[in-house]
Amino acid sequence: MTAGLLGAVAPGFDRPLDVLEACHGRITKQCDTLNKLLTHLPINGADAQAQQAARAVLAYFDTAAVHHHDDEERNLFPLLEWVGASGACDLVETLTLEHDELALLWRRLRMELQQIEKGEASTLDETLTGRFISLNRSHLEFENTHVLPLARQVLGTAEIERLGRAMAARRNVPFVY
């Protein structure tokens, strides 16, 4: 575990499933920010707060969320298939398709957020933003209630370490076990 500057404790890559779950919490917080932007913008426009919020959402989904999907698609999902987890193939197919849809939605939403970040626009497409938030929330709920418990059940110590090492390497940080 690593302590943050503000005292928050984040799991280390020696506990990669906890890292993924913590990331789900951060994605949820970014979705909360998007939801707040939907109500903030019509009243306040692209003021400094809106620009800062857009910047934070952009930074998160352009970096950490990309790593997160790579962690799952390149490492976790193949490990679940490799150990022969029940239903893993169907699960992986469904979740990968959802990741693809989220990526498409993000590309469209990203353009709008960039305009808000620059103060050049003061609206978000409510349907697009709502779909992005809704799909993220249902996707994360499913992963938290089905995928992560399955992984905790079927992955052994060696697979967990392999996952953690890959996740740390993706971020260019040392793996400490």
Q: Which positions does each model-derived feature cover?
A:
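Small-residue-biased structural context
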Residues: 1-177
